[in-house]
């Protein structure tokens, strides 16, 4: 193996990364620094400290990144109304750039010459982590054990852990459960019965949301206040970004909002089925489009929609730190200067229904849009010339004998 003196490992404390920790120590004979990120995954992160200490790790980083995650990554993404392939709200994808950033920061702080992660060679995360790392520290060495070792099943990982006395909690028999990933934006489920695209997901799989059938029979109303495209208050109460998302997750989950079962196209070429719970994000997307509907110029709104697919693809495929994503972000953020106001929503049994929107920056003019007497605010006779000019090219083509069918 190449000389490695110190490596920073993205460490969850679970089976995979605990095995990786021991494997790095034995294979590279190097010092390992562990980094555990609290992104609001809903699990205690402190046990990772005890596990790392038990395995001889001397430098242990456990960072609360919830506010930075939502403020600097989730909110900017939602300003673009970002959706991948029409459905996926990119809950896993958007967390990876922050983890990569912090891995590199810790490597610089500790003098480490390598970083390591637990992403497999089949998935998107290996690309996301490593593109981010190379963008931020071009000369860094990246160690991806799943692309090097022969521990290619959960059973082999468990056997390795037992052989090397790695502290791992065992639940029941040796059986592959769902592969899950969680943060403050979502929780994902892959593998197991989901690998058969015809098999319905099991109800007890879901952890954050009630089934819409079991959600309350009474609707919940919410008012979201926007400033420059970001939510700053719920029902008039100002909140930090992370608190906004956590609160929307709770309320949305209670109302059966945010479940998704999709087959997506991975960057590496394969199709993959995943189930997702994104209650807060689902609410945020609907509300943001509602406030933009009255505050954005038509052509700006349409251009944003055209650019969104590219922006979503950049995030999904790991190009958050690329110059093209940064360029698009500047355009998106410039469009949000007038995206201010309040959106009222009704949440009911899995549905997010917009019931009102208002803004001092609204471009909606009731005097012009009214079906009643507009007192001359809009001259309907002007429409005749507008229509004729827009039809001119088609009229010319028809006069030249061009056939349409």
UniProtKB/Swiss-Prot annotation:
<feature type="binding site">
    <location>
        <position position="118"/>
    </location>
    <ligand>
        <name>ATP</name>
    </ligand>
</feature>
<dbReference type="GO" id="GO:0005524">
    <property type="term" value="F:ATP binding"/>
</dbReference>
<feature type="binding site">
    <location>
        <position position="276"/>
    </location>
    <ligand>
        <name>L-citrulline</name>
    </ligand>
</feature>
<keyword id="KW-0963">Cytoplasm</keyword>
<dbReference type="GO" id="GO:0000050">
    <property type="term" value="P:urea cycle"/>
</dbReference>
<comment type="similarity">
    <text>Belongs to the argininosuccinate synthase family. Type 1 subfamily.</text>
</comment>
<feature type="binding site">
    <location>
        <position position="128"/>
    </location>
    <ligand>
        <name>L-citrulline</name>
    </ligand>
</feature>
<dbReference type="InterPro" id="IPR014729">
    <property type="entry name" value="Rossmann-like_a/b/a_fold"/>
</dbReference>
<dbReference type="InterPro" id="IPR023434">
    <property type="entry name" value="Arginosuc_synth_type_1_subfam"/>
</dbReference>
<feature type="binding site">
    <location>
        <position position="37"/>
    </location>
    <ligand>
        <name>ATP</name>
    </ligand>
</feature>
<keyword id="KW-0436">Ligase</keyword>
<feature type="binding site">
    <location>
        <begin position="10"/>
        <end position="18"/>
    </location>
    <ligand>
        <name>ATP</name>
    </ligand>
</feature>
<feature type="binding site">
    <location>
        <position position="188"/>
    </location>
    <ligand>
        <name>L-citrulline</name>
    </ligand>
</feature>
<dbReference type="GO" id="GO:0006526">
    <property type="term" value="P:L-arginine biosynthetic process"/>
</dbReference>
<dbReference type="Pfam" id="PF00764">
    <property type="entry name" value="Arginosuc_synth"/>
</dbReference>
<keyword id="KW-0055">Arginine biosynthesis</keyword>
<feature type="binding site">
    <location>
        <position position="124"/>
    </location>
    <ligand>
        <name>L-aspartate</name>
    </ligand>
</feature>
<comment type="subunit">
    <text>Homotetramer.</text>
</comment>
<keyword id="KW-0067">ATP-binding</keyword>
<keyword id="KW-0547">Nucleotide-binding</keyword>
<dbReference type="Pfam" id="PF20979">
    <property type="entry name" value="Arginosuc_syn_C"/>
</dbReference>
<dbReference type="InterPro" id="IPR048267">
    <property type="entry name" value="Arginosuc_syn_N"/>
</dbReference>
<feature type="binding site">
    <location>
        <position position="124"/>
    </location>
    <ligand>
        <name>L-citrulline</name>
    </ligand>
</feature>
<feature type="binding site">
    <location>
        <position position="264"/>
    </location>
    <ligand>
        <name>L-citrulline</name>
    </ligand>
</feature>
<dbReference type="GO" id="GO:0005737">
    <property type="term" value="C:cytoplasm"/>
</dbReference>
<feature type="binding site">
    <location>
        <position position="120"/>
    </location>
    <ligand>
        <name>L-aspartate</name>
    </ligand>
</feature>
<feature type="binding site">
    <location>
        <position position="93"/>
    </location>
    <ligand>
        <name>L-citrulline</name>
    </ligand>
</feature>
<feature type="binding site">
    <location>
        <position position="88"/>
    </location>
    <ligand>
        <name>L-citrulline</name>
    </ligand>
</feature>
<feature type="binding site">
    <location>
        <position position="125"/>
    </location>
    <ligand>
        <name>L-aspartate</name>
    </ligand>
</feature>
<comment type="pathway">
    <text>Amino-acid biosynthesis; L-arginine biosynthesis; L-arginine from L-ornithine and carbamoyl phosphate: step 2/3.</text>
</comment>
<dbReference type="InterPro" id="IPR018223">
    <property type="entry name" value="Arginosuc_synth_CS"/>
</dbReference>
<dbReference type="GO" id="GO:0004055">
    <property type="term" value="F:argininosuccinate synthase activity"/>
</dbReference>
<feature type="binding site">
    <location>
        <position position="179"/>
    </location>
    <ligand>
        <name>L-citrulline</name>
    </ligand>
</feature>
<dbReference type="InterPro" id="IPR048268">
    <property type="entry name" value="Arginosuc_syn_C"/>
</dbReference>
<dbReference type="InterPro" id="IPR024074">
    <property type="entry name" value="AS_cat/multimer_dom_body"/>
</dbReference>
<protein>
    <recommendedName>
        <fullName>Argininosuccinate synthase</fullName>
        <ecNumber>6.3.4.5</ecNumber>
    </recommendedName>
</protein>
<keyword id="KW-0028">Amino-acid biosynthesis</keyword>
<dbReference type="InterPro" id="IPR001518">
    <property type="entry name" value="Arginosuc_synth"/>
</dbReference>
<dbReference type="GO" id="GO:0000053">
    <property type="term" value="P:argininosuccinate metabolic process"/>
</dbReference>
């Amino acid at each position: 193996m190449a000389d490695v003196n110190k490596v920073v490992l993205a460490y969850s404390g679970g089976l995979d990364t605990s095995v990786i920790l021991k494997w790095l120590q034995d294979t590279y004979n190097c010092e390992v620094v562990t980094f555990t990120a609290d992104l609001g995954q809903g699990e205690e992160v402190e046990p990772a400290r005890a596990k790392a200490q038990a395995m001889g790790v001397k430098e242990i980083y456990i960072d609360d990144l919830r506010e930075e995650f939502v403020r600097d990554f989730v909110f900017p993404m939602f300003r673009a109304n970002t959706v991948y392939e029409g459905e996926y709200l990119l809950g896993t994808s958007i967390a990876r750039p922050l983890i990569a950033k912090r891995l590199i920061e810790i490597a610089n702080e500790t003098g480490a010459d390598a970083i390591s992660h637990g992403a497999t060679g089949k998935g998107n995360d290996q690309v996301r982590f490593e593109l981010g790392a190379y963008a931020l520290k071009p000369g860094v060495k990246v160690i991806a054990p799943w692309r090097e070792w022969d521990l290619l099943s959960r059973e082999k990982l468990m056997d390795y852990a037992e052989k090397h006395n790695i502290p791992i909690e065992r639940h029941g028999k040796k059986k592959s459960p769902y592969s899950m990933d969680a943060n403050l934006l979502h929780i994902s489920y892959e593998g197991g019965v989901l690998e058969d695209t015809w098999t319905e997901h099991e109800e007890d799989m879901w952890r954050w949301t009630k089934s819409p059938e079991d959600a309350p029979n009474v609707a919940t109303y919410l008012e979201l206040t926007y400033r420059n495209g970001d939510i700053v208050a719920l029902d008039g109460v100002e909140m930090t970004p992370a608190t906004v998302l956590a609160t929307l997750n709770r309320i949305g989950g209670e109302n059966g909002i945010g479940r998704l079962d999709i087959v997506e196209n991975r960057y590496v070429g394969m199709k993959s089925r995943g189930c997702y719970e994104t209650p807060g994000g689902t609410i945020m997307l609907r509300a943001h489009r509602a406030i933009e509907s009255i505050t954005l110029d038509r052509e700006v709104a349409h251009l944003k929609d055209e650019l969104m697919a590219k922006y979503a693809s950049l995030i999904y495929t790991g190009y958050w730190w690329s110059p093209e994503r940064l360029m698009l972000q500047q355009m998106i953020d410039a469009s949000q200067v007038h995206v201010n106001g309040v959106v009222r929503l009704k949440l009911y049994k899995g549905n997010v229904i917009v019931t009102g929107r208002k803004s001092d920056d609204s471009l909606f003019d009731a005097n012009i849009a009214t079906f009643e007497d507009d007192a001359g605010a809009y001259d309907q006779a002007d429409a005749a010339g507008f229509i004729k000019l827009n039809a001119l090219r088609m009229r010319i083509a028809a006069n030249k004998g061009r056939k349409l069918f």
